[in-house]
Design a protein with these regions (language model features):
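A short amphipathic alpha-helical interaction element
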Residues: 1-44, 54-55
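Alpha-helical interaction/regulatory segments in DNA maintenance proteins
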Residues: 46-60
């Protein structure tokens, strides 16, 4: 579910153009890294706390 939220947020912001399928695959990781770079974050491709926070996604 978290991956779906991240994909949707990245799509709204123009970083992700793939299917919102909940899979943390290569295309999703590339989009995360691009977003992290634009935000001045470490480019890990992971859904870390800082990245989620910048995307406005709260962790349950």
């Amino acid at each position: 579910m978290m991956v779906v939220r991240v994909q949707a947020a990245l799509m709204r912001l123009g970083y992700y153009t793939g299917d919102i399928d909940g899979s943390l695959g290569p295309q999703t990781r590339v989009a995360i890294k691009a977003y992290q770079k634009a935000q001045g974050l470490s480019q890990t491709g992971r859904m870390d706390i800082q990245t989620l926070s910048r995307l406005g996604i709260s962790i349950p």
